[in-house]
């Protein structure tokens, strides 16, 4: 069975720290210890951290995307650890931080401008949740002409009514790979 991309003759992409921007989506406490706890957090979180270290070592562009909810919201509650970026991923000077209020990281943010200034054509997406923010960002990125790559072992999701997290991730990533981007392992990005 062939993907939509392959039927169009679009070859799979590769990524390196030299030719791409790392975009870390919603790596926040809500997904580690909140109501939206990710089922594979123990596996995906270290892979995000490892990629971040590769990009930092290469002095490559990095964007941290954080989801913000209204004051008093029960998810990503402002002023609590649930809203904070994971400690090991804390942005360093020179790393962009984009605050979003919608599932897609491009919607009503300056992400497009930041990426354009990087001079790169590829974006490597990692983070949470595969079926919502990662998928929406991949789709928005592809629509804007970015070569989208998802590090499939550096994303995760939670169980939702009717679908367990592993199946949800599998389907979300298959949809991205069919039309919007390329899936790679984090270890294949150097």
Swiss-Prot record:
Gene3D superfamilies documented for this protein: Isochorismatase-like
Cleaved signal peptide residues: none
Keywords: Host cytoplasm, Host nucleus, Hydrolase, Secreted, Virulence
GO molecular function term, any single one: isochorismatase activity
SUPFAM superfamilies from the UniProt entry: Isochorismatase-like hydrolases
Domain of life: Eukaryota
EC class name: hydrolase
Coiled-coil stretches: none
Knockout-associated phenotype: Leads to a significant reduction in virulence and increased the concentrations of both free salicylate and its glucoside (SAG) by 100-150% in inoculated cotton plants.
Keyword Hydrolase found: yes
GO biological process terms on file: effector-mediated suppression of host innate immune response
Induction line: Expression is up-regulated during the infection stages.
Entry's Gene Ontology cellular component terms: extracellular region; host cell cytoplasm; host cell nucleus
Function, as annotated: Secreted isochorismatase required for full virulence of V.dahliae. Suppresses salicylate-mediated innate immunity of the host by disrupting the plant salicylate metabolism pathway via hydrolysis of its isochorismate precursor.
Family under the similarity heading: Belongs to the isochorismatase family.
This protein's name: Secreted isochorismatase effector Isc1
Naturally occurring in which organism (per UniProt): Verticillium dahliae (strain VdLs.17 / ATCC MYA-4575 / FGSC 10137)
UniProt lineage: Eukaryota, Fungi, Dikarya, Ascomycota, Pezizomycotina
Gene expressing this chain: Isc1
